[in-house]
Regions:
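A short, Lys/Arg-rich alpha-helix, primarily the initiator
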Residues: 1-20
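Short, charged recognition helix plus adjacent turn
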Residues: 3-4, 56, 66-76
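Helix-turn-helix DNA-binding elements, focusing on the entry/boundary residues of the two helices
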Residues: 13, 24-25, 48-51
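Short alpha-helical DNA-recognition segment
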Residues: 21-38
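Short, conserved catalytic or interaction motifs in soluble domains
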Residues: 41
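DNA major-groove recognition helix of helix-turn-helix/homeodomain DNA-binding modules
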Residues: 49-64
């Protein structure tokens, strides 16, 4: 498990919820049928299908989801 990547994904999901009228975990979970609380607590590492469902819900592309993550960091 890549904990750094997981934390970046968790922060991105939280950011999207807050950008869209401060939706609760429950609202997103109900709309997507996903375990958002478990994802945001780091208990579940999301797969690409899970992230794709979140992207469809927020009407964004996978590129738009991952663009602000800047991962993996460039070697110096």
């Amino acid at each position: 498990r890549d904990e750094e990547l997981l934390q970046k994904i968790i922060l991105r999901v939280k950011e999207l919820r807050h950008m869209h009228n401060h939706q609760s975990q429950e609202q997103l979970a109900e709309a997507t049928e996903l375990g958002i609380a478990q994802l945001e607590s780091g208990k579940n590492f999301p797969n690409l299908t899970t992230i794709s469902i979140i992207c469809k819900f927020y009407n964004i592309t996978l590129d738009e989801f991952f663009a602000p993550l800047h991962y993996p960091p460039k070697e110096k």
